[in-house]
Regions:
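Short glycine/acidic-rich loop motifs that flank beta-strands on beta-rich extracellular proteins
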Residues: 154-160, 194-200, 218-224, 251-258, ...
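Extracellular polysaccharide-degrading/modifying enzymes targeting complex plant/algal/animal polysaccharides
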Residues: 1-189, 230-232, 462-473, 481-532, ...
């Protein structure tokens, strides 16, 4: 028998390069300095140009990409080219000629270059490394760091550098630790990192990071745990506390990154942190896809203020994100808002997001609002519980369940769901298609009209066995327009047993100046994106 002709036998060719439009890539001066940054659905990859054929409009990359280019929904995969001398045309831009070591910079309006302090880091990726030998039961122990600022590392950009699968896990930290136990970082700063901030890796346990400022990062801020379960089993990372830290301003170079990453690690506490301005995820818990056994369990994510995440960059991210089996993990009393996906893709930008295999997780007493795609989203998972939360203004698909499975996917009970687009639950990723239990919930749409439930009326939705003891009624927030989600004394939610959420307790605590520090951050509004271009013309058959 004969087989149909295939463009490629595997994904490998789609990782090596791509077809571009006429004129988008050309042989610039100092061509070898140019970098191509490719936006995949949930990460970016950075490449040098290995080969260029302008006539055929083909560019080949070094290194190759971890993900096939055009994977998922990105048929019009976004990319940009940077570090090109000819593109230096606006204030605030710079270009580095690697051959001569010359840095060219276009000053900002009113900037006096005679008074500018310019710092070029000479440390390559890691500034401080704690090197215990946990495999030999030899540890670095009982140290306290107070009031120290760890600053300035370079990032590694090379044709043979690894590219990431997810979460900037191939990038090095400014402060790295293995076999670190019973240590405290207090009132410290980690800043101006070319890649990641702090990583407590193999064998790190019972450490505390408290009241630290972590900012201006090329990638992610804090990692707890190893990537692989082999290391996690023999050299566990556990019982670490990340409390009352101001973590803000990452993803500057490696954009698919997050504020806090808890990998193959258990019994950790991530509490009372202010986490903002990362391009993929605020807090990520778990690093195992599907239902395979994993060593991530019993983690607590509580009283965090997570906001301004994704920022129009990606189509698959969230404020608080989970991955894999994680029994005993609790997500409680967090406030999550302003999670903005790229408008070019149909999904992404979730408040609380259970991704592949998320299992055994309790989500309670959280307030989620102003997210682009879903306030509560489950790709697929088992026996999760969302109760006593406020989900407001949840975008296109406020409450979702993407993959039907034979087991109970989740229970949704005692929540308040406030919509403003006439839809309470998604019809695209419909919870009605999954095994889900809905009960004792209060729904309201700001239009005053009855919202739809996965495309059907409330009565039809109830006939499926869901929400038979639930109501549609105004929850009587103090001022939902101003995002004041405190409940008035006469709220029907209180009569239904809803427990008031102490919203004001989320985020930083302590001295007034420390608590007020996040309010001093100034953000530019997100620029409008141009409409996507049409698909490129097909190449002629030869």
């Amino acid at each position: 028998p004969f087989n149909r002709a295939k463009w490629y036998e595997s994904d490998i060719l789609a990782k090596q390069g791509f077809l571009f439009r006429n004129g988008d890539i050309r042989r610039w001066e100092n061509f070898d300095d140019a970098l191509i940054v490719i936006y995949h659905s949930w990460t970016t990859s950075i490449h040098f140009i290995k080969e260029l054929d302008p006539k055929e409009r083909i560019v080949k990359l070094a290194p190759i990409s971890t993900w096939p280019i055009g994977y998922w929904w990105e048929y019009n995969t976004r990319y940009h080219v940077e570090n090109v001398a000819e593109a230096l045309d606006q204030p605030g831009e710079w270009y580095l000629d690697r051959g001569t070591g010359t840095l060219s910079y276009w000053p900002l309006p009113g900037e006096d270059m005679t008074k500018v302090e310019a710092i070029a880091p000479i440390v390559r990726q890691t500034l401080v490394a704690f090197k215990g030998r946990p495999e030999a039961k030899r540890f670095v122990e009982h140290l306290r760091f107070r009031g120290i600022s760890f600053q300035h590392t370079e990032c590694l950009l090379a044709p043979d550098m690894p590219t990431d699968q997810q979460g900037a896990t191939e990038r090095a930290p400014l402060v790295a630790a293995e076999g670190l136990r019973h240590c405290v970082f207090e009132d410290c700063e980690i800043a101006h990192a070319g890649e990641n901030g702090l990583w407590l890796d193999r064998g790190c346990s019972d450490n505390v990071v408290r009241r630290c400022r972590i900012r201006d990062l090329g990638a992610s801020a804090v990692f707890l745990g190893p990537k692989a379960d082999g290391d996690a089993a023999s050299m566990p990372v556990e019982r670490n506390v990340l409390d009352n830290n101001f973590i803000q301003g990452g993803s500057h170079i490696f954009r698919g990154s997050q504020g806090v990453w808890v990998g193959r690690s258990s019994h950790n506490q991530v509490t009372h942190n202010e986490i903002a301005d990362f391009c993929h995820i605020g807090i990520s818990v778990g690093h195992s896809w599907g239902y395979a056994p994993t060593s991530a369990h019993d983690n607590l994510v509580a009283f965090n203020h997570v906001h301004h995440i994704s920022n129009g960059m990606f189509s698959d991210g969230g404020g608080i994100y989970t991955l894999g089996i994680s029994p005993g993990t609790v997500i409680r009393n967090n406030v999550v808002h302003d999670v903005t996906p790229t408008p070019l893709m149909p999904v992404g930008g979730c408040g609380i997001y259970h991704d592949e295999g998320s299992t055994g997780i309790l989500v309670e007493n959280n307030v989620v609002y102003d997210v682009g795609a879903a306030a509560y989203h489950q790709h697929y998972g088992r026996e999760n519980v969302a109760r006593n939360n406020i989900f407001a203004f949840g975008g296109r698909d406020p409450i979702t369940c993407a993959r039907p499975e034979e087991h109970l996917s989740y229970t949704f009970e005692g929540n308040i769901a406030l919509s403003n687009a006439g839809q309470a639950t998604s019809d695209h990723f419909s919870p009605m298609k999954c095994k889900t239990e809905f009960r004792r919930n209060l729904y309201w749409d700001t239009s005053g009209k009855e919202p739809l439930f996965s495309g059907v009326s409330f009565a039809e939705w109830q006939r499926t066995g869901r929400d038979r003891d639930s109501r549609i009624a105004d929850p009587q927030f103090y001022d939902a327009k101003r995002r004041d989600f405190r409940l008035k004394p006469g709220s029907p939610a209180l009569a239904m047993g809803f427990r008031p959420i102490p919203i004001e307790q989320a985020g930083l605590y302590g001295e007034a100046a420390w608590v007020a520090a996040p309010s001093k951050v100034r953000r530019e509004p997100l620029p409008p994106l141009p409409p996507p271009p049409p698909p490129p013309p097909p190449r002629p058959m030869v």
